[in-house]
Amino acid sequence: MLTSGLTNAPITKLLLIYTIASSIALSILDIKHLASIHVSPHLWPYAQFWRLATWQLAGFTNSTEALFAAMLAYHLRVVERAWGKRKFATFIISTLPYTSLLPPLLLVLLRPLTLYKLNYLPCGPTATLFALLAQYHAGIPHTFRYRISTSTSTSTSTSTSSANRDTDASGRGEGAQGKHLTLLLSDKSTTYLVAAQLALSQFPGMMLPAAVGWVVGVAWRAEVLPVPSARWRVPAWAVGEKEMGRRGTQGGEGGERYEDLRRRLEGEAVAAAAAASGNAGSASEASGQRQRRREGGIMDRLRAL
């Protein structure tokens, strides 16, 4: 059964609130000009390199982008439920250097290739959201699928027959006097539609962080993303969890229960090994007795001769 709302998704809830609150703060404080990046003049000649670290942490500069970013973050809550809040927070923090530094650096490289037309990088956590979207695409299966069909014909009867032919598995067909197009969609299609709207909101500037975020997410999932330590995790106390014991059990009654189960299994293993060795000893003793009887029978026959 699907869980509604932001239940069991505290990190997603925090991300959603931060996205909206930071966007509102940019408007109230009138500091939108400090959030985005223009290669010229911000990076040079002004050398405002601090923007490389703050452009993604700031909110969005208009309400449309903030709305679609909040909707996308809400749809991505299922990733946190599937992973757990500790792994979810670890992913965001470990990919943050790449999603923050790669888009501005690529913008600097692409600017001369586009005849200095590509000069603007919109602010907002777009790259992080699309890195999470890559995990949503790869790890979350669809719940249901549906088809949307369109048809055109010259008469009502041909329209009816063409609509009936739209339900075949191939999704392609052509009636005697009508044509139709069938789109196969799923419950995840609305999430991709929201993401596409966000990526195209300030074309082409917003496309760059969206593409970089997707590539970073795919690289992280394929384990080709260079990270300082692949085993590093956010501390459990940082996300409200308890530290796991040496044997992977938590303290308290749960730990005692698992410890009792471990001791019982070890006792059963020892008993089974002892029984197996006892059976082997009994079998060897019985074979020795049979050998002695056979030798005794041979000696009796020799004496009789």
UniProtKB/Swiss-Prot annotation:
Its EC number is 2.3.2.27. Residues 294-305 have a biased composition (Basic and acidic residues). It is an enzyme of class 2 (transferase). Residues 152-175, 273-305 are annotated as: Disordered. GO terms for cellular component: endoplasmic reticulum membrane. The chain crosses the membrane at residues 9-29, 52-72, 90-110. GO terms for molecular function: serine-type endopeptidase activity; transferase activity. Disruption phenotype: Impairs growth on solid media under hypoxia and leads to triazole susceptibility. Impairs virulence in a murine model of invasive pulmonary aspergillosis (IPA). It is found in: Endoplasmic reticulum membrane. PANTHER family: RHOMBOID-RELATED PROTEIN (PTHR43066), UBIQUITIN-ASSOCIATED DOMAIN-CONTAINING PROTEIN 2 (PTHR43066:SF21). Component of the DSC E3 ubiquitin ligase complex which is required for the srbA transcriptional activator proteolytic cleavage to release the soluble transcription factor from the membrane in low oxygen or sterol conditions. Required for growth during hypoxia and triazole drug susceptibility, as well as for virulence in a murine model of invasive pulmonary aspergillosis (IPA). This is DSC E3 ubiquitin ligase complex subunit B. It comes from Aspergillus fumigatus (strain CBS 144.89 / FGSC A1163 / CEA10).
